[in-house]
A protein has these predicted regions:
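Short, amphipathic alpha-helical "recognition" segments used to contact nucleic acids or chromatin
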Residues: 42-56
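Short alpha-helical "recognition helix" segments of helix-turn-helix
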Residues: 60-66, 72
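An N-terminal domain-cap segment
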Residues: 31, 39-40
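DNA major-groove recognition helix of helix-turn-helix
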Residues: 76-79
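N-terminal leader segment of winged-helix/HTH proteins
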Residues: 1-33
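Short helix-capping and inter-helix turn/linker motifs at the boundaries of alpha-helical repeat units
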Residues: 4, 38-39
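Amphipathic alpha-helical protein-protein interaction surfaces
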Residues: 22, 38, 54-57
Length: 79
């Protein structure tokens, strides 16, 4: 049987995430799926995005999250 296209696998992953009902289910899912460093990086980027949306300045965000200026800039470009 041929392997599904990458896009189809991505859609399946996102649909699975949408079907999670509790924070505990989400934590378990992501801890099973991701390495600790990957989770930490995602959490840091989420924090950066939240602070950018609040209108915080780069230096404050870098001090608060310990993210690099490159990470803050990358997240800002994606918003």
């Amino acid at each position: 049987m041929p392997r599904p296209a990458k896009h189809e696998r991505s859609i399946a992953m996102y649909e699975t995430i949408l079907n999670l009902h509790t924070v505990e289910e989400c934590v378990n899912f992501f801890e099973d799926l991701c390495a600790a460093t990957e989770l930490s990086a995602m959490e840091q980027r989420f924090d950066v995005a939240s602070l950018l949306l609040e209108g915080r300045v780069y230096t404050e965000i870098m001090d608060t999250t310990k993210a690099s200026s490159a990470t803050v800039s990358r997240v800002n470009r994606m918003l």
